[in-house]
Curated annotation (Swiss-Prot):
Gene3D superfamilies: 1.20.5.370, 6.10.250.2420
Region (Disordered): 216-244
Ranges of biased composition (kind: Basic and acidic residues): 232-244
Miscellaneous comment: The cardiac alpha isoform is a 'fast' ATPase myosin, while the beta isoform is a 'slow' ATPase.
Classification via PANTHER family: CINGULIN-LIKE PROTEIN 1-RELATED (PTHR46349), MYOSIN-6-LIKE (PTHR46349:SF6)
Name under which the protein is recorded: Myosin-7
Compartments, as annotated in UniProt: Cytoplasm, Myofibril; Cytoplasm, Myofibril, Sarcomere
Function: Myosins are actin-based motor molecules with ATPase activity essential for muscle contraction. Forms regular bipolar thick filaments that, together with actin thin filaments, constitute the fundamental contractile unit of skeletal and cardiac muscle.
Keywords: Actin-binding, ATP-binding, Coiled coil, Cytoplasm, Motor protein, Muscle protein, Myosin, Nucleotide-binding, Thick filament
GO terms, molecular function: actin binding; ATP binding
Known partners and oligomeric status: Muscle myosin is a hexameric protein that consists of 2 heavy chain subunits (MHC), 2 alkali light chain subunits (MLC) and 2 regulatory light chain subunits (MLC-2). Interacts with ECPAS. Interacts (via C-terminus) with LRRC39.
Length: 244
């Protein structure tokens, strides 16, 4: 009976210890599961941030490409304006030379007029006025061309500055994407390790649960044997009293 009682107590102690181990493993497993859920949420948020950063990077790249195209177009327009300005400048010089020539001829004509060539002089004066008007018109057009050229130069400077800013933003966004991707990889690795640890603890939990079931079964058997022995002992005591 004492041996059976000790077995029962040992079984009960083993049952208590096993229950405590089960509770500890259950707490650890719950903590790991919560940690994995948090890491999954962080990973999802990081993936969203990466997608937004990549989209922003693409938008900045498109904007930079457009700015470069606009700058190229403005440079082409500036070149055309410069060519036009150079052409007008050449025309201006030619007109000035023509006026000088005509003025010289006019001076000569005045001499002729003094000798009776008044009609020829009037024609030359009319021609001089006509050329002066043309020169004035050309000068106005030249001034407009210079104004347009300066405006184009300012626009090119603005586009160049904007292109440089877009390029810097593009580099910054690319660096951000690289850092976020590294962070995502680290979270994925931690999540995989946590899941592996959770699976290991689950296996341990199942093993301990099996041991607990066996310990409970042994405890029940021991308790049943103790009860039988007690009943048998009472029967033996009763029979002894009756025989006396």
């Amino acid at each position: 009976v004492e041996q059976t009682e000790r077995s029962r107590k040992l079984a009960e102690q083993e049952l208590i210890e096993t229950s405590e181990r089960v509770q500890l493993l259950h707490s650890q497993n719950t903590s790991l599961i919560n940690q994995k859920k948090k890491m999954d949420a962080d990973l999802s948020q990081l993936q969203t941030e990466v997608e937004e950063a990549v989209q922003e990077c693409r938008n900045a790249e498109e904007k930079a490409k457009k700015a470069i195209t606009d700058a190229a177009m403005m440079a082409e327009e500036l070149k055309k304006e410069q060519d036009t300005s150079a052409h007008l400048e050449r025309m201006k010089k030619n007109m000035e030379q023509t006026i000088k020539d005509l003025q010289h001829r006019l001076d000569e004509a005045e001499q002729i007029a003094l000798k009776g060539g008044k009609k020829q002089l009037q024609k030359l004066e009319a021609r001089v006025r006509e050329l002066e008007n043309e020169l004035e018109a050309e000068q106005k057009r030249n001034a407009e061309s210079v104004k347009g050229m300066r405006k184009s130069e300012r626009r090119i400077k603005e586009l160049t500055y904007q292109t440089e800013e877009d390029r810097k933003n593009l580099l910054r966004l690319q660096d951000l994407v690289d850092k976020l991707q590294l962070k995502v990889k680290a979270y994925k690795r931690q999540a995989e390790e946590a899941e592996e640890q959770a699976n290991t603890n689950l296996s341990k939990f199942r093993k301990v649960q099996h041991e607990l079931d066996e310990a409970e079964e042994r405890a029940d058997i021991a308790e049943s044997q103790v009860n039988k022995l007690r009943a048998k002992s009472r029967d033996i005591g009763t029979k002894g009293l009756n025989e006396e």
